[in-house]
């Protein structure tokens, strides 16, 4: 009887594995009505979280982000886009406008979430967490945060570090 109880407790412990703090948030995908739990969808993957904007000098990074996503998603990599109007008012459109722009201009297929605030002092809980862990809050559009398969925030990258950066690519490859 005792071994049976131990096995049951072990199975229950395995099923209640905690969600990593960096993914323990829920957000609504663009134009969706129901939020998704990031942990349920992306735990165990290498995640690149990016704050985006459609009218920014860095907006062409969408192309590189999509390319990176397409090349590496089969190996457990995902890009998560979070549109924000925080910097320069460069994401003024509705969610429908954002989705149409991303799909028609850049063919974006990586997950894009609700328009949100990412700026220090106003950031949504995910970006507040990422800034607290890395010591770096977004200072402009297209800041990037890399999270490993265990949910540890590995590094923050500024807007200047593009998706085709050898440094970023090497770090992602090392985590896959």
Feature-to-residue mapping (PLM):
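Hydrophobic h-region of N-terminal signal peptides that target proteins for export
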Residues: 8-17
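A short beta-strand-turn-helix
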Residues: 25-46, 67-72
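Loop/turn elements at helix/coil->beta-strand transitions in domains of secreted/extracellular proteins
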Residues: 43-47, 73-78, 106-111, 141, ...
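Amphipathic alpha-helical repeat scaffolds
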Residues: 51-55
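Structural microenvironment flanking redox-active thiols in thiol-disulfide oxidoreductases
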Residues: 58-123
